[in-house]
Amino acid sequence: MTEKLYEQDSMLKSCLATVLSCAEDKGGYAVVLDRTVFFPEGGGQLSDRGTLGGVKMTYAAQRGSEVVHYCERPLPVGVQVEAVLDWQARLDHMQQHAGEHILSHAVWKLFGANNIGFHMGERLVTIDLDKELTAAELEQAEDYANSQIWEDKPITVSYLPHTELSALVMRKKNEKLTGMLRIVTVADGDICTCCGTHPVRTGMIGLIRINRFDKHKDGIRVEFLCGRWALEDARRKNEYIWQAGRLLSMKPEGVPQGLRKLQEEVTGLNERLKAQTAKLYEFLAPQLLAQAAVDEGGIKYVAAAQEDCNAADAKLLLNKLLADGRTVAAVVYRSGERINFVVGSGEQTQADCRSLCSLAGGLFGGRGGGSQHFAQGGGAYGDDWRQKVLQLQQLLKE
């Protein structure tokens, strides 16, 4: 059994501990101590990390009554080592977890929304709510949550028999929990059963910032950050806005309007380009058909190589080649280090584009698929790709 010092004192940064066991596991070494300051991943919170006797410890996990520490090198059984937390990582995790409690309490108190899911990743924290809230309501909850932080209220840990849980006013109660329960309380605020680590005062959280929310099942998923993670995220995004402003020759507050104007201009240019491309293909298609191979029944077979082309343009040219219903055609175009192709057959032909696509895939070292009258695929780029297009035209006829 491992004594979990973090449960009583989340501010403890190191301790002396005895190595009870050490075994190779998961490409490293699984070490069990008689006592630890390292919180193992669980309850939505990330694992602590740090060092054991100077050896890097990257992950801690709960295994029954033991905490297993995964280290880069083995440690001798029976020796005493110093366990030292990566304190910045611990503080980051505590800020997120305590912030989650406070934000969850805010949406519950103000709008009756319940937190039914919590996830903490690296620089990403989410809660799932069982009802939909508006952006204005979430902003109100964010303001309330931050007011709880700035009042610098105590956060305390206590233990209570499960039989006395009903006496507490809690936003959620897990009736399946039995025995002595660990209760985390924010003064005059959230009360919750929790196994995680938390700062001793709300002021240590610093800040809660909601970044986005999306529809999720019958409610919403709220993405937010707290403390240092929130500060660094805000710095990055502020720099993005300033960079956009410099590119647009505008102040930051003018960026949205500038982007809308730029988007309108790009949309207009794309429409003009699309119209010009259609005119070009009206001119190009007859030229390609004039060079097509023709069988005894008058069915034409043509393969076109296009350098400056995208998928939409390729399909547009293909449709113009197939317009008479008596043509089998392929348009092959380069996209970076890949060759892509679309294959089509007119309604009056017997060609199966799935088979033709396989032929093209064989030529270009790739694959594809589709239906009888249309298929598409791709392969690796080679300097001889244009010569292979000529071969493909003959294969289409055969």
Describe the predicted segments one by one.
Residues 30-31, 64-73, 125-131, 373-380:
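A generic structural motif
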Residues 36-52, 76-127, 372-373:
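Active/ligand-binding-proximal structured segments within catalytic/core domains
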Residues 59, 116-120, 212-213, 330-334, ...:
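Short beta-strand
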Residues 89, 108-218:
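Functional cores that coordinate and move charged inorganic groups
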Residues 199, 211-258:
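A conserved active-site cap/scaffold subdomain adjacent to cofactor or substrate pockets
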